[in-house]
Design a protein with these regions (language model features):
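Structural signature for extended repeat/solenoid scaffolds and their inter-repeat hinge/linker regions
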Residues: 1-122, 126-129, 135
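Long terminal segments
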Residues: 118, 125-159
Length: 159
């Protein structure tokens, strides 16, 4: 009070039986955090070099320097993981990519698309091109055009 350190005002609180600390107290004091009245959490794990931000509804952000990762999670079981293996998008339900412009997928290695059910591609025109071999295989295979069907090649073998 009045800039006199002999009359300091200290505002704070202590833990007790009613208000227990969020972490078990220990000698090394490596876990620290802030929890608000509405249960918003910010935690620091010094030995593991991890910072976590969490809401009571299940939204969570984890920054992990030791594990070299960043993870976003929500209450709907959706997550985005960035780590040394790459980026993993995991959805509890559907995953939708939308763009007002074009979407381009590029890979320096093989690219796989797998589905447990039907796989459909639709557009005004469809162009598939291979610089070496193009293969189409199925238990039954159907090629159908509402107009004419053109098959061209240096040599064509039918059965």
């Amino acid at each position: 009070v009045n800039s006199d350190p002999r009359f300091a005002v200290i505002i704070g609180s202590l833990y007790g039986k009613k208000n227990k600390p969020p972490f078990t107290p220990e000698t090394k004091n490596k876990d620290k955090g802030i929890i608000t009245k509405n249960k918003l959490k910010l935690t620091f794990e010094d030995d593991k070099k991890i910072i976590t931000i969490e809401t009571p509804g299940g939204q969570k952000v984890t920054l992990d320097d030791k594990g070299k990762s960043l993870k976003l999670e929500d209450q709907n079981k959706n997550s985005v993981l960035l780590d040394k293996k790459g980026i993993t998008l995991d959805s509890g339900k559907d995953l939708i990519l939308k763009s007002k412009g074009k979407i381009t997928m590029k890979s320096g290695a093989a690219t796989e698309i797998k589905s447990g059910a039907d796989l459909k591609a639709q557009g005004v025109n469809l162009a598939l091109k291979a610089s070496a071999k193009a293969g189409l295989e199925g238990a039954t295979t159907e090629i159908k055009g509402s107009g004419k069907v053109v098959v061209k090649g240096g040599m064509i073998n039918l059965n």
